[in-house]
Amino acid sequence: MRVKRGFKARRRRKKVLKLAKGFRGGHSKLYRTAADTVDRALMYAYRDRRQKKRDFRALWIARINAGARMNGLSYSKFIYGLKQADVALDRKVLAELAISDPACFAEITSLAAKQA
């Protein structure tokens, strides 16, 4: 007896077109172009989930560097001083402090300057 695939192909195509929802033109309507676009979108999503971590770390470092230099210290000396003083604040928190609470950040900078 011949085996037919039945609903499987339709289910696969429907899944791809569901993922392609919101794309413009044929990229959300035509299966072949939608499949290519979805593949590319998933590749970019995978890559950029990792890239996002690098981008945010670079942003935090730039903000900390700006805050440290306003208080007369370079970024590397600031981080070295914090390590020596056993201050366990990560770069995300330090960057937030540099923006939202400059007075507190200045105190931390003076603590790091004593150790550096």
UniProtKB/Swiss-Prot annotation:
Transcription in keyword set: no
Protein name as it appears in the record: Large ribosomal subunit protein bL20
Alphabetized UniProt keyword annotations: Ribonucleoprotein, Ribosomal protein, RNA-binding, rRNA-binding
Cellular component, GO annotation: ribonucleoprotein complex; ribosome
Family of the protein in this entry: Belongs to the bacterial ribosomal protein bL20 family.
Highest taxon above the source species: Bacteria
Function: Binds directly to 23S ribosomal RNA and is necessary for the in vitro assembly process of the 50S ribosomal subunit. It is not involved in the protein synthesizing functions of that subunit.
Encoding gene per record: rplT
Entry-linked NCBIfam families: rplT_bact (TIGR01032)
UniProt xrefs under HAMAP family: Ribosomal_bL20
Residue ranges that the Swiss-Prot or TrEMBL entry lists as coiled coil: none
Protein source organism: Desulfatibacillum aliphaticivorans
